[in-house]
Swiss-Prot record:
Interacts with SEC61B, SEC61A1 and the SEC61 complex. Interacts with CANX. This is Stress-associated endoplasmic reticulum protein 1. Residues 1-33 are annotated as: Disordered. GO terms for biological process: endoplasmic reticulum unfolded protein response. InterPro entries: ER_stress-assoc (IPR010580). Interacts with target proteins during their translocation into the lumen of the endoplasmic reticulum. Protects unfolded target proteins against degradation during ER stress. May facilitate glycosylation of target proteins after termination of ER stress. May modulate the use of N-glycosylation sites on target proteins. It is found in: Membrane; Endoplasmic reticulum membrane. Keywords: Endoplasmic reticulum, Membrane, Transmembrane, Transmembrane helix, Unfolded protein response. It comes from the Eukaryota. It is a single-pass membrane protein. The keyword Endoplasmic reticulum applies. GO terms for cellular component: cytoplasmic microtubule; endoplasmic reticulum membrane. Residues 17-30 have a biased composition (Polar residues).
Length: 66
């Protein structure tokens, strides 16, 4: 009897899963009114370091290549 009940519960859970297909729950993204988790200065520093190191690497490869 317990096995039949367990199978019935699994079938109900599965059928709920099928009928709700395509209904995606809301994401955990910030609402439009909330602030970003990274400040503008930290973002600017990160971009400066990444772009600066890329430019430095390009200049160094040009010097060594010629």
């Amino acid at each position: 009897m317990v096995a039949k009940q367990r199978i019935r519960m699994a079938n109900e859970k599965h059928s709920k899963n099928i009928t709700q297909r395509g209904n995606v729950a809301k994401t955990s993204r910030n609402a439009p009114g909330e602030k970003a988790s990274v400040g503008p200065w930290l973002l600017a520093l990160f971009i400066f370091v990444v772009c600066g190191s890329a430019i430095f690497q390009i200049i160094q490869s040009i010097r060594m290549g010629m």
